[in-house]
């Protein structure tokens, strides 16, 4: 099963002239408890943190010390297991053109992990999702928390941000972390079975 998935992933490399593709554990909301476990799908690794790099001929799984034994049990048949710290220094991928879904990485991660020794191509579709057939994400409703619980309503919080923007002569602010949006708007949701934080940006 994993071998078939890896082949389907590699079959997409030619379209983007890729030498490899990087798959993180987190989703676009940087939650380790994602409804889309792309890393688990392509590697069979079920830990809460890690990266897979699939090249044209080899597969690598980077995990930290918590998961070394687990990764060997779950993924060593198809992947070489490497300590997570070595992703910063490894020359395995030197001069390779690695494809990434930019929504799944911070700019710092891209600079530190990949641009140091490689070229990076931002792929405008997720190559794992192309073979990971799941139901479309359901739009779950949010619910609001009362001021008695939060201490301030969302209008009061937004007014503070607007005052800051005016003071700093800024036009807008982008809030990427769902937990910060949840705090600002006093909302919670049902997107995750393990957390009340809704999947959102602002």
Residue ranges and their predicted role:
Residues 97-102:
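Short glycine-rich phosphate-binding loop at a beta-alpha junction
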Residues 1-93, 104-105, 109-202:
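N-terminal accessory/capping or targeting/presequence segment of soluble
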């Amino acid at each position: 099963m994993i071998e078939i998935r890896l082949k389907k992933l590699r079959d997409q490399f030619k379209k983007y002239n890729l030498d490899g593709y990087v798959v993180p554990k987190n989703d676009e909301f940087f939650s380790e408890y994602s409804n889309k476990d792309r890393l688990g799908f392509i590697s069979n690794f079920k830990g809460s943190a890690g990266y897979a790099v699939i090249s044209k001929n080899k597969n690598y799984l980077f995990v930290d010390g918590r998961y070394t034994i687990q990764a060997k049990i779950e993924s060593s048949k198809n992947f070489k297991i490497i300590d997570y710290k070595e992703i910063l220094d490894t020359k395995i991928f030197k001069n390779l053109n690695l494809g990434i879904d930019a929504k799944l990485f911070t700019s710092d991660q891209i600079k530190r992990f990949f641009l140091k020794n490689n070229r990076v191509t931002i792929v405008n579709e997720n190559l794992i999702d192309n073979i990971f057939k799941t139901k479309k994400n359901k739009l779950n409703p949010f619910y609001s928390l009362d001021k008695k619980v939060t201490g301030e309503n969302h209008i009061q919080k937004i007014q503070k941000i607007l005052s800051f923007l005016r003071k700093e002569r800024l036009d807008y602010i982008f809030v990427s972390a769902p937990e910060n949006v949840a705090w600002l708007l006093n909302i919670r949701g049902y997107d995750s079975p393990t957390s009340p934080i809704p999947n959102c940006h602002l």
